[in-house]
């Protein structure tokens, strides 16, 4: 549902790494973090993060290269998993 769609920020504070930070959406929500070197295709899932952590670090990226990130939420209710829309895509040049 739309109210589960996360808002994200991305920063590269260390070499070959990016940190993605998002707003928490409550208990039982998981966050899937995706990244790509192209804005509109080629996304890979970097991690699925449990509800209490509002951030993830993606490692082993290429220095001086631009990457794109997006996050979506999932919540399982009575055995059925619901997915949010993806966050707005954010890009960053890796240190």
Segment roles from a protein language model:
Residues 58-80:
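Beta-strand-rich modules
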Residues 27-47:
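Extracellular low-complexity, O-glycosylation-prone stalks/linkers
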Residues 2-27, 63, 80-95:
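Pro/Thr/Ser/Gly-rich low-complexity, intrinsically disordered linker/stalk tracts
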Residues 22, 45-46, 66:
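Residue-level detection of beta-strand scaffold positions
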């Amino acid at each position: 549902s739309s109210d589960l769609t996360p808002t994200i920020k991305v920063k590269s504070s260390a070499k070959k790494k990016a940190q993605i930070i998002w707003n928490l959406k409550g208990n039982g929500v998981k966050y899937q973090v995706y990244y790509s070197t192209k804005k509109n295709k080629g996304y890979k899932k970097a991690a699925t993060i449990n509800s209490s952590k509002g951030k993830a670090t993606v490692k082993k990226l290429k220095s001086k290269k631009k990457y794109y990130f997006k996050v979506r939420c999932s919540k399982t209710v009575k055995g059925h998993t619901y997915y949010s829309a993806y966050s707005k895509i954010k890009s960053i040049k890796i240190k």
